[in-house]
Amino acid sequence: MIASHLAFEKLSKLGSKHTML
């Protein structure tokens, strides 16, 4: 579960940049 949460944070950061574009 914890690993999934960490992966989600990474995707969230990447997604944030993509959303900005």
Swiss-Prot record:
General function of this protein: May inhibit growth of bacteria.
Its subcellular locations are: Secreted
Q: One of this protein's GO BP terms? A: defense response to bacterium
Keyword Secreted recorded: yes
What lineage, starting at the top, does this entry show?
Eukaryota, Metazoa, Ecdysozoa, Arthropoda, Chelicerata
Keywords for this entry? Amidation, Antibiotic, Antimicrobial, Secreted
Gene Ontology, cellular component aspect: extracellular region
Q: Does the keyword Secreted apply?
A: yes
Where Leucine amide occurs, the residues are 21
| Reported tissue expression | Expressed by the venom gland.
Task: State the protein's name.
Answer: M-lycotoxin-Ls4a
Domain of life assignment: Eukaryota
Q: Which family does it belong to?
A: Belongs to the cationic peptide 04 (cupiennin) family. 05 subfamily.
**Residues annotated as transmembrane:** none
